[in-house]
Amino acid sequence: MTAFEIPTVTTAEGSLSLGQSLFQGNCAACHGAAGEGGSVGGGEVAPSLNVATPTQIGEALRTGPGVMPKFGPEQLSEHEVSSLARYIVWLRDNGDPGGLGIGRVGPVAEGFVAWVIGLGLLFIVIRLTGTKT
């Protein structure tokens, strides 16, 4: 069992686009697309990342707490760890893109809600204006 050194995480040196790509490929399945946690084990196994500091993110990546896999320097370089931390901080600080937030899911869910309400109203109008035979 190899012990990894806690990386020095500097979000200013990280790449936001690389961080997003790494997050989607390695983290989103458990922590959720918005880093809210709860995708696995209701937040007990994969907690929300909203309060994690960049150093805590780097430490978690290297040590793999609980069932989380460890990402050593051969899997993620210091630059990649900083990029991941930058993206996670960006997720937390930039709120809900795409209008009114519905559980931080964004405009796809809003469009779905609009369709459901629109179709419901259309059904009511058809029902009220229709004739009985």
Where are these regions (language model features)?
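Sequence context surrounding c-type heme c attachment/ligation sites in exported
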Residues: 20-24, 51, 55, 105-108
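Extracytoplasmic electron-transfer domains, predominantly the class I c-type cytochrome c fold
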Residues: 1, 34, 40-96
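C-terminal capping alpha-helices of c-type cytochrome domains
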Residues: 1-5, 73-130
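Periplasmic/extracellular electron-transfer cofactor-ligation site
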Residues: 2-7, 12-15, 20-45, 90-98, ...
